[in-house]
């Protein structure tokens, strides 16, 4: 087949020349339109179908200067279309449907490319415009062309054509070109300024062609590129026709275009947008489209519904249309493991939370399972950024008893307590228009003011009681404005005050304007917790470890004065008799004392953590709360509850009761009966070596035993008993030292041979007198009685040194201190342990006591610490065990050291709890070790 014969229109230069020639013709020229019509049409057709469609064709067209004549041609057409109707040859008035008249000028007949002589543009003119607008729209798909069109002033002619040429095809291509130009922010602003929006809105209602409607809708969507432009579109009525079209969209393509446009217009939904969409009847179709089979339509519709929730005025209607169920179901699907990413859930979470602001929607959300969904989000650490918003939304259910019961059953209270502990950010502020529509704003005219009020106001201003008319309200009266409490003008801040800062109220203001309590990040969580605490028996939810931990973390960790609501919650719980047993079972009373009174928080144990503290404030609060519990415990109900708990409770409850009693019982008859007569103290001591039921159990136990010791014996016991006085600063004279010199006096008649080969001099008579063991060894029938060099097996020089001193009558000379290692070094396996064993083997009880006293002075004295207590206890000496117990429970030790010492004692005791129990029991009861202890 022969190749197609080349034509003139195959040349871009020829086409551009024809375009330039047509653009340069004057409207009143004498050229016959027929001489240029066919070449121009052929050139435009070739440009659109071949040159522009080719690879790089748009850029070549722009580089060769094709945009300037193309815009000139459109500008001439726009000018002709907007010219006033005049009588003249070849001219006729345009029809009303065209919306404008375009007669030829009086100077002569106009070229057919720009004239109108019929109710619609002439066929040749319409064809020329269709081709030119199509070329321009294609060119505007590239950024460089959009920039040049804007520079050449091509936007205004397009707006004029949109106004004058009401043919669907021309409207379609013009809207398409404007939509492409609107992709540039600068061009978008120029299109708005040129007044294109009302014309596009008019096209929505007048046009019947689906393609044209899609182009107009797309142009409006692209024009909504900023909040200001979206608001302008809504205020110019662009939303309502879109909503009306949504219900009657003839095909899926137009439906998708409408959904995409409404999605863009509803971003940051304005009041005008919501009102127009509601008036246009768009809510029902939107809810229906949420189940559309096409994913793009379905997801776009759901996002539109989510955006609309930002306006309170439309949320009730949205709920009536079924939007609540749609949004809840969609969020539930996206929450599934195989659902969408967390980022895609954010607008839905925000929408569901906003729906909680109206009572009617809260009921729908509750029935749709929204409470379970919100609780799942609260439990999800990946959704932590949304937690403040969700908690604030749940405040809407504050007086919904059924919903509160469901939320409590789902575990809301521990999650709220976690909110008080966390570092979650502030809840995102919503606009004023997102407020609940249960209480819509009403603009009522001001009431007419009576003459008596005007006279009173005039007199108050003249006398200086008011500075202006606004200072006095017609609603004010002495009965409505209670007097302010008498307080100094500048009260001095007291460190023990726990009140939140208050703001003075102006007497002339209405009582409704009273300043409420501070509302910070923790406000919603505290409000919900306060509501739960007002139940008849809130113990199951609030008197638990997590709940108390969260409240106390907030109270002690707040940078400023904590919210009074948190203090009221704690006070309300401690004053409620129904909560007494829960405070005992959960170690809540012990936690209040440890955290608030003693300043030891769970995360400060066992290693302290640096934190800013206001201990005096917290101590006052803790003592007040414990006093509340004391009142409950010493009431007839409390006595019965504690007695039942101690005698008939589970083993864990009995131990918790025994531990808590010294903190909340001050009546001697009560604590003596429960702890001493009915075995509560022994229960507590026996539990020390069992697995701890609470992270701070041993700290609590040390504090409890110390408090009980103070109750039993108000006088303070010395930390180190004075069984054998030993003044280390001025030791007694040494009686053994003369035997060690070069000329000993008296001369030794005996030497002891150690395993190391060292020979130690001794006096036979003194050694036999000091110990029954050596008396039998050296004066009896043993072979050693005839020997001058007596071996002492299993004894090192350091351990033998205090033995030799003691045999020769040294008491308090300091020799007993020699084998004792300094604090921080182990005693087991040391020469001190060896010396103690030797003293027992050689029947030297005085030496044993002296060595034990030396160990106590070094390891349990001022230089020793709680870590030494366990080391001393490991020696297994009853007197040293008593030393350790007295050191641990001594009132001069800080609570932290007491707790750490008890931890060391329990570790040292291991499974053999008997010696530790007896030592602690004897110290608490004030009984010397070895005496009879009451059963």
Swiss-Prot record:
Processing after translation: Ubiquitinated by a BCR (BTB-CUL3-RBX1) E3 ubiquitin ligase complex, leading to its degradation. Deubiquitinated by USP7.
Molecular function in Gene Ontology: ubiquitin-like ligase-substrate adaptor activity
Ranges of the ARM repeats in the UniProt entry: 143-183, 185-225, 227-267, 271-310, 312-357, 359-403, 405-444
SMART domains: ARM (SM00185)
Subunit and partners: Substrate-recognition component of the BCR(ARMC5) E3 ubiquitin ligase complex, at least composed of CUL3, ARMC5 and RBX1.
UniProt disease link: ACTH-independent macronodular adrenal hyperplasia 2: A form of macronodular adrenal hyperplasia characterized by multiple, bilateral, non-pigmented, benign, adrenocortical nodules. It results in excessive production of cortisol leading to ACTH-independent Cushing syndrome. Clinical manifestations of Cushing syndrome include facial and truncal obesity, abdominal striae, muscular weakness, osteoporosis, arterial hypertension, diabetes.
Name by which UniProt lists this protein: Armadillo repeat-containing protein 5
Protein source organism: Homo sapiens (Human)
């Amino acid at each position: 087949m022969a190749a197609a014969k080349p034509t003139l229109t195959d040349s871009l230069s020829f086409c551009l020349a024809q375009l330039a020639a047509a653009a340069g013709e004057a409207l009143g020229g004498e050229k016959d339109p027929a001489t240029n019509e066919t070449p121009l049409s052929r050139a435009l057709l070739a440009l659109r179908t071949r040159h522009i469609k080719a690879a790089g064709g748009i850029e070549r067209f722009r580089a060769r200067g094709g945009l300037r004549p193309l815009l000139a041609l459109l500008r001439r057409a726009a000018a002709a279309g907007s010219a006033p109707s005049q009588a003249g040859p070849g001219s006729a008035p345009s029809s009303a449907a065209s919306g404008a008249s375009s007669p030829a000028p009086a100077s002569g007949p106009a070229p057919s490319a720009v004239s109108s002589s019929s109710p619609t543009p002439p066929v040749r003119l319409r064809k020329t415009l269709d081709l030119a607008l199509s070329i321009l729209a294609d060119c505007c798909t590239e950024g460089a062309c959009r920039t040049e069109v804007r520079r050449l002033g091509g936007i205004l002619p397009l707006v004029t054509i949109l106004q004058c040429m009401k043919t669907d095809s021309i409207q379609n291509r013009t809207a398409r070109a404007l939509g492409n130009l609107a992709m540039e922010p600068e061009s978008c602003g120029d299109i708005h300024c040129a007044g294109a929006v009302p014309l596009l809105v008019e096209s929505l209602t007048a046009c019947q062609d689906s393609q044209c409607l899609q182009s107009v809708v797309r142009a409006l969507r692209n024009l909504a590129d900023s909040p200001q432009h979206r608001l302008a579109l809504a205020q110019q009525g662009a939303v309502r026709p879109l909503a009306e079209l949504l219900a009657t969209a003839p095909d899926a393509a137009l439906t998708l275009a409408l959904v995409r446009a409404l999605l863009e217009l509803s971003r940051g939904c304005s009041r005008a947008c919501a009102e127009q969409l509601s008036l246009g009847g768009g809510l029902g179709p939107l809810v229906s489209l949420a189940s559309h089979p096409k994913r793009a339509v379905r997801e776009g519709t759901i996002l539109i519904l989510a955006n609309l929730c930002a306006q309170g005025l439309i949320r009730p209607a949205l709920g009536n249309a079924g939007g609540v169920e749609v949004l809840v179901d969609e969020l539930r699907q996206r929450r599934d493991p195989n659902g969408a990413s967390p980022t895609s859930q954010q607008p839905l979470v925000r929408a569901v939370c906003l729906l909680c602001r109206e009572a009617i929607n809260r009921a729908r959300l509750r029935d749709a399972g929204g409470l379970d969904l919100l609780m799942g989000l609260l439990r999800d650490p990946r959704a932590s950024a949304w937690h403040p918003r969700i908690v604030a939304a749940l405040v809407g259910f504050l007086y919904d008893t059924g919903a509160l019961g469901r939320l409590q059953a789902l575990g809301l209270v521990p999650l709220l307590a976690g909110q008080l502990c966390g570092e979650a950010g502030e809840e995102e502020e919503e606009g004023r228009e997102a407020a609940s529509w249960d209480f819509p704003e009403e603009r009522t005219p001001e009431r007419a003011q009576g003459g008596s009020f005007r006279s009173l106001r005039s007199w108050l201003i003249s006398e200086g009681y008011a500075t202006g008319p606004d200072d006095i309200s017609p609603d004010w009266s002495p009965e409505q404005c209670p007097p302010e409490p008498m307080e100094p003008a500048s009260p001095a801040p007291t460190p023990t005050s726990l009140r939140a800062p208050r703001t003075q109220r102006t007497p002339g203001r209405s009582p409704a304007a009273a300043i409420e309590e501070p509302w910070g990040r923790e406000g919603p969580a505290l409000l919900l917790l306060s509501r739960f605490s007002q139940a008849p028996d809130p113990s199951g939810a609030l008197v638990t470890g997590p709940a108390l931990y969260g409240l106390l973390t907030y109270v002690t960790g707040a940078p400023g004065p904590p919210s009074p609501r948190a203090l009221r919650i704690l006070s309300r719980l401690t004053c409620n008799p129904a909560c007494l047993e829960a405070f005992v079972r959960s170690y809540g009373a012990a936690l209040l004392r440890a955290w608030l009174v003693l300043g030891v928080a769970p995360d400060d144990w066992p290693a302290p953590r640096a934190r800013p503290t206001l201990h005096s404030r917290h101590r006052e609060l803790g003592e007040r709360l414990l006093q509340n519990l004391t009142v409950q415990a010493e009431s007839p109900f409390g006595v019965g509850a504690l007695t039942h708990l101690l005698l008939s409770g589970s083993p864990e409850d009995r131990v918790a009761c025994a531990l808590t009693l010294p903190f909340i019982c001050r009546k001697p008859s009560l604590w003596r009966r429960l702890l001493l007569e009915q075995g509560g103290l022994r229960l507590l001591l026996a539990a020390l070596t069992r697995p701890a039921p609470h992270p701070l159990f041993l700290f609590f136990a040390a504090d409890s035993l110390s408090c009980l010791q103070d109750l039993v014996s108000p006088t303070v016991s010395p930390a180190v008993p004075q069984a054998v006085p030993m003044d280390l600063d001025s030791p007694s004279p040494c009686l053994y030292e003369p035997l060690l010199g070069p000329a000993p006096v008296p001369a030794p008649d005996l030497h002891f041979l150690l395993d190391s080969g060292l020979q130690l001099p001794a006096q036979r008579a003194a050694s036999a007198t000091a110990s029954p063991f050596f008396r039998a060894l050296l004066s009896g029938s043993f072979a050693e009685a005839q020997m001058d060099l007596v071996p002492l097996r299993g004894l090192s020089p350091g351990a033998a040194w205090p033995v030799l001193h003691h045999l020769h009558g040294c008491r308090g000379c300091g020799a007993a201190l020699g084998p004792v290692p300094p604090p921080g070094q182990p005693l087991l396996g040391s020469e001190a342990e060896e010396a103690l064993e030797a003293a027992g083997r050689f029947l030297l009880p005085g030496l044993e006591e002296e060595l034990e006293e030396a160990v106590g002075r070094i390891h349990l004295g001022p230089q020793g610490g709680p870590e030494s207590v366990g080391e001393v206890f490991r020696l297994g000496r009853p007197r040293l065990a008593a030393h350790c117990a007295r050191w641990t429970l001594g009132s001069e030790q800080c609570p932290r050291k007491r707790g750490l010492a008890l931890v060391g004692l329990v570790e040292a005791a291991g499974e053999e709890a008997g010696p530790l129990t007896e030592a602690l029991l004897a110290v608490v009861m004030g009984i010397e070790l070895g005496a009879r202890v009451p059963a």
